[in-house]
């Protein structure tokens, strides 16, 4: 999955911890997109296991943002500008469980002009990064 970080929220002073990953493969290859996949913990706000993504551009509201691994698919049903979230904590728990077992996950999304992008994330090291983020923010 990549890495784990803990930071302080400048507004509340509360701790924010997250596991994050950069794509190992992107389609299309052209362009420099700052795509990421996150699982975040914000104890001050009573938020844990928050799954989010950014594809490095503002999303097209007419198309779905989907994470898929094997036969499992998960819809990011909240999108604001260049970030997307899953509104159901139950679904977030399912995707995290899948991320702990799988080796790869793909996020498919569409930019404002309707062009599709696919970001492939390795899940090697996800469980370690997730456990560390969770431990540091509880």
At which residue positions do the language-model features occur?
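A generic "folded-domain core" signal
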Residues: 3-4, 8-138
């Amino acid at each position: 999955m990549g890495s784990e970080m803990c930071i302080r929220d400048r507004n509340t002073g509360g701790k924010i911890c997250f596991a994050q990953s950069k794509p190992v493969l992107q389609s299309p290859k052209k362009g420099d997109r700052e795509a990421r996949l996150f699982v975040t913990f914000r104890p001050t706000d009573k938020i844990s296991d928050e799954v989010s993504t950014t594809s490095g551009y503002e999303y097209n509201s007419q198309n779905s943002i989907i994470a898929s691994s094997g036969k499992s698919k998960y819809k990011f049903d909240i999108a604001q500008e260049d970030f997307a979230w899953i509104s159901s904590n139950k679904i977030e728990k399912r995707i995290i469980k899948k991320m702990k077992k799988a080796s790869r996950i793909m996020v498919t999304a569409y930019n404002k002009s309707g062009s599709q992008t696919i970001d492939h994330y390795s899940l090697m090291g996800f469980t370690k990064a997730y456990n560390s983020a969770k431990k540091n923010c509880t």
